A protein has these predicted regions:
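Negatively charged
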Residues: 1-116
Length: 116
């Protein structure tokens, strides 16, 4: 899937689980500008960009304060290397494997709470 998603209305969306995870040949090539999405109601981003090997867009302004699961969000997203230092994450959010096998895995400035 690589259709235009830049104008998706996510105002009622609570789960973005697996949205761009290995959904076909083009899944790895996904690299659209989704920085303007309102994800303030999303509670689950588990596996969202898992395997999205080309994705490297600025999503640093997203309001992720409602998210309780970032489980493997960027796992094997081998191009993703954006500044997420302004993300305010909920205490106790599940961040297991959030950056594993991505360029951000060993970058301490991007570590999620509780992963140091």
């Amino acid at each position: 899937f690589n259709g235009d998603v830049t104008t998706w209305d996510l105002s009622s969306c609570s789960s973005m689980t697996n949205v761009f995870k290995h959904t076909g040949v083009d899944a790895g090539r996904f690299n659209q500008d989704i920085g303007g999405w309102d994800v303030s109601y999303v509670t689950n981003m588990g596996n969202m960009f898992y395997g999205a090997t080309d994705f490297n867009r600025d999503i640093g302004d997203w309001n992720v304060s409602s998210v309780t699961s970032f489980y493997y969000t960027f796992y094997t997203a081998s191009s993703f290397n954006q500044d997420l230092s302004d993300w305010v994450m909920k205490d106790g959010a599940d961040v297991r494997g959030m950056y594993d096998d991505s360029p951000m895995e060993n970058n301490n400035s991007y570590k999620a709470p509780g992963t140091f």
